[in-house]
Structure formats: structure tokens, C-alpha cells
Amino acid sequence: MIEDILEEAEESMKKSINHFKSELAGFRTGRASTSLVEDIKIEYYGSRVPIKQVGNVSVPEPNQILIQVWDQNAISPIEKAIMEQLSLNPARQGNTLRITLPPLTQERRKELVKLLHKTTEEAKVAIRNIRRDAKEMIESLEGISEDEIKRALDKLQKITDHYIDEISNLSSSKEKEITELK
């Protein structure tokens, strides 16, 4: 019973970490990355689909993203979505869109670091909330000795610390990436 609660808590924490990683991938660091545009949703034949489903996204140069669109009808919606969501102006060349990323200003880097810290704190709070819920479930179990509960709570804390550390490490490396001058 206790093991099930701990496994469920750890599984939820892994999901939180994966969500945090996907949020980090969207941070613009001055270096081009396919993750910056591939999940942007566009209106395409009446439904909303990510760019990666209507074209091939690549990074030919460190400050450029290239989108080779498979269907001519998707080019305008992609251009519009990129302008709205990233405030970048893609250059059209036939069925290809080229996005050149301007270098980040020092001010923008500071804003990104603030946003990173906020996102990091939200991820840590999510992990702590999972720990709190699991702790309450463990403490409410009937017919379990105090020692077993104590051992389970210690194990839960170790799991929590591991994932909090992982979030901190991911955040630190992303912050270095943002503040690094190119």
C-alpha cells in the first residue's frame, strides 16, 4: 500500500519534470532551436495543428530556423502564428520560411532569467504539492506502525529532494545558456 503511494507520487513527479523540460525548451536563448517553433499551433483546414505536422523544421545556422512547408496553403497561417507568438518576421522563399533570430539584448536576457526563475519555482511547488498529497495519504493509512510511516515519509522526502535538485540543475544550465553572450 505504501509502495503504491510512493510509486504514484514518483510517477507524478516525473510528469512534472517532463512538463518543466518542455517549458524550458520554449525559452529563447539567442541560439536557434526547432523547439521554438515546432509546437506553435496554426489554423489548418479547420483544425489547430502544430507547425511540425505541416512542415519540416530545421536549424541550418545557429541563429536561423528553416521551415520547409509541405502544403502551400499552410504558409500564411504559419507566418501569422510566428509573427503573433514570437514577434519575429519570417522571410518567405517559395515553400520555405526562414526565421533569423536577432541577438538577445541584455534587458531581454534579464527578463528571460526572471521568467525562468518563476517557471522554476512553479515546478518546485508542483513537486512539493505531490509530496504533500502523498504524505497525507500515507499518514491516513490504517493499521500501519509509526516506524513504517516514518520510513515511508523519509523515502518520500528523498524522492522529493531528488526531483527538486533535478529542477534546480535544469534551471541553472538554462540560465547559463540565456546569460551567455554570443
From Swiss-Prot:
GO terms (BP aspect): translational termination
Keyword Protein biosynthesis on entry: yes
Keyword set includes Methyltransferase: no
Subcellular location(s) per record: Cytoplasm
GO cellular component: cytoplasm
Alphabetized GO MF terms: ribosomal large subunit binding
Keywords of this entry: Cytoplasm, Protein biosynthesis
Classification via Pfam families: RRF (PF01765)
Protein family according to the UniProt entry: Belongs to the RRF family.
NCBIfam families hit by this protein: frr (TIGR00496)
Role played: Responsible for the release of ribosomes from messenger RNA at the termination of protein biosynthesis. May increase the efficiency of translation by recycling ribosomes from one round of translation to another.
Protein name per its UniProtKB record: Ribosome-recycling factor
Protein's organism: Hydrogenobaculum sp. (strain Y04AAS1)
Classification lineage: Bacteria, Pseudomonadati, Aquificota, Aquificia, Aquificales
